[in-house]
Amino acid sequence: MKTEFGFSNLVGTIFSKGNLVFTPDGFSILSPVGNRVSVYNLKDNTSYTFPFENHKNISHIALSPTSTLLLSVDEEGRCILCNFLRRSVLHYFNFKSPVGAIEFSPNGKFFAVSLGKLIQVWRTPNSLEEREFAPFVLHREYTGHFDDIVSISWSADSRFFISTSKDLTARLHSVDPIEGFHPCALTGHKNTVVSGFFSKDQQTIYTVSKDGALFVWKYSPLFQAGEVIDEEAEENKTRTHIWLIKERHYFNQNSKLRCAAFHPTSNLLVVGFSSGLFGIYELPSFTMLYQLSITQSNIDTLTVNSTGDWIAIGSSKLGQLLVWEWQSESYVLKQQSHYDALSTLQYSSDGQRIITGADDGKIKVWDMNSGFCIVTFTQHTSAVSGLCFSKRGNVLFSSSLDGSVRAWDLIRYRNFRTFTAPSRVQFSCIAVDPSGEIVCAGSQDSFEIFMWSVQTGQLLETLAGHEGPVSSLSFNSSGSLLASGSWDKTVRIWDIFSRSGIVEPLPIPSDVLSLAFHPDGKEVCVASLDGQLTFWNVQEGKQTSLIDGRKDLSGGRRFDDARTAENSSLNKTFTSICYSADGSCVLSAGTSKYVCLYDIITGVLIKKFQLSKNESLQGVQEMLNSRKMTEAGSIELIDTQGEESDLEDRIDRTLPGARRGDLSARKTRPEIICHGVQFSPSGGAFAAATTEGLMIYSLYNDFLFDPINLDMDITPSTTLTMCAEGEFLISLVMALRLNEYKVVQKVYESIPITDVEHVVQELPVSYLANFMGYLSSFAAETPHIEFHLRWMKSVLTYHGEYLRRKNFEFASQLTSLQKSIVVLSKRLSQLSSNNEFQLSFLLDKMHLRLENTA
């Protein structure tokens, strides 16, 4: 199997902290998710996440007006400049101080960044005008504020900008010195000035403060100021105008104003409050157009798209991201992350959806094509401990610590069956037989396994024998054997349909944390507390091999660790394992920042994937900074929330003894942990449920250059030349040896349909797996339905016997072909239904007209 997996997308986390940014076309929105940036296309209903990572959680992002450059800045001021279209990093830069705000100028030539009390304006990298060796060139620095700057707003002509600060003032600056212009301070607010904006004609400035006050400033002649500015006029006779407060407005809300956004073209002001309320006002009349409460927590950021129709709202506490169309009063996007950590995940049988369960008791269904949450189930009242699909994939089973096992219909999105035990127990794991008729759940209280009938909902049997909490359950492929692992250091294989109740336990050196059956059902892999993976022959009850993965998990230190990263493997274990589709490899993850892929036959580590480089999480850094260690411990763990300026931020709502959730320590640094890992049914991707969300890793066929038996005379040009000369088989083999996606597609589509059977019949089997992978991709992307089906039929006809004998080796390719056929079937059936309805409508119209004429 291929192992060139790379980061593909991050779902499950919609918004973490920072600011939201619309693209200039107004159809896509950029959202910071931890130390990454996700892009949600609201028009095409798709999403993706940039592959680069900041050192820590992102605090600010900015997009150039041409949508070519993206700046992302983390909490410590480290900046990444990337090409937005190519998704590639261009430059790393360190501002050496936390950034309060960063904004591109409307003409795209500059960007302004606030560093404490200081503002720096930098030239935007541009290779067309002034070629510079340095990516960032400092243009000017601006001072004048006496406290941290919180926002920057540019004028439409990019000549001026407004900065607002915690010193209760806003200041007006010019990018370049202008004759007759003097930087001025706009004073009068009684609290932090949150934002300042220019009107469309730039003759009016609006400033909004944290206490809910809106000041309207007008550019007035100096003589109207009277005697107050006579002394200043004598000192500087070049000043002829001054900014004066013309109007004062108040929002009169019993909460703090958190953020504001202004759309100059339509004169719309949008404000968000700490109570979860946001309002839309028309300026300069200060007419309230709309007011709505969307959440019970703070609104942290607001932004308006280029047309002024859509308003994006972000709340970091609940992980909410909303896009509201205020004219139609409807949601364009409404997504929310899990409130607590992910605990489990499960792929659907077609690989189109991933279901996640979390400690908040919610189950979310995520669409892999769009990256959005389709539905959320909230019936569980405690943490979700396990998820499992039936064979058909339309029924989902979940277990929870609330003592219930629930069956969900994923067509109607409802809970149609609930299974409970005779006594109150907490279920820690779940398994469903391949037929979908029997569901089993393990208990961590009574150490028993409960078995129910899905059709009747009745408890069939209780399997007893374990002497510790049952940690994992798994059925084999035939459904006759059930494997159970427990903390009592044993694995038991239950033949649930036999009359004999004798079960011989398999001894494990340490507590069992997870187990999984091989796809052929003859082998079981067990992960234990000592970091080992043991493989057992189920029929003989003998251990066949062992992999010690503790050293592979080592790396990363907690902020209070006294051990080095190399010696930090004592508490690192595998908590989730999964076989590949062909059964040749096993994927394992646990209490570490790594996901390990092992070859079963040799027991060798093939590849190790690092889940995150976010140093805001514990267990990521290899080296700790001794300067951050104090007598009270690490600075990273010291609670500074009591020093906040607002009363609602200083209130201590913690509960003594709470280690997780909202009532735990006010300043928490979560640890990077993978709670679950699973391959997709096709084997072309795998998903990991981590602290930062649901991470998807897939094979990059479009960018992968993996030549097979490459010769000097095999090039794209010679390959296409051979195809043009009619040597279709030779050109196809050459394209597969090059393994370039575009070349293979060009040759594939150039072969006449009459020659398909001949080409497939003579195709060497060594290229069959690679070609089937390309065939499934072409069928899902291009509209040549009959052409693709002819290829698939020929492959299965002439190589069917070989595929049957090597079914485990080609399991992922066959699953991908089946998935492509389902996509083609849905596409064709929808088109046929539409045509049928249109023809029926036209015939009815014709009959009606004939009846009227008669």
Curated annotation (Swiss-Prot):
Residue windows of the WD repeats: 9-52, 53-93, 94-132, 144-183, 188-227, 252-291, 294-334, 337-376, 379-418, 422-464, 465-504, 507-546, 569-608, 668-709
The UniProt record lists the keyword Hydrolase: no
GO cellular component: cytosol; nucleolus; Pwp2p-containing subcomplex of 90S preribosome; small-subunit processome; sno(s)RNA-containing ribonucleoprotein complex
Gene Ontology annotations of biological process type: maturation of SSU-rRNA from tricistronic rRNA transcript (SSU-rRNA, 5.8S rRNA, LSU-rRNA); ribosomal small subunit assembly
Gene Ontology molecular function terms on file: snoRNA binding
One Pfam family this sequence matches: WD40
Database matches in PROSITE patterns: WD_REPEATS_1, WD_REPEATS_2, WD_REPEATS_REGION
UniProt keyword annotation of Ribonucleoprotein present: no
InterPro entries to which the protein is assigned, alphabetical: G-protein_beta_WD-40_rep, PWP2, Quino_amine_DH_bsu, SSU_processome_Utp12, WD40/YVTN_repeat-like_dom_sf, WD40_repeat_CS, WD40_repeat_dom_sf, WD40_rpt
Residues bearing PTM Phosphoserine: S645
Keywords: Phosphoprotein, Repeat, WD repeat
Positions bearing Phosphothreonine: T640
Family recorded in the similarity comment: Belongs to the WD repeat PWP2 family.
Protein name per its UniProtKB record: Periodic tryptophan protein 2 homolog
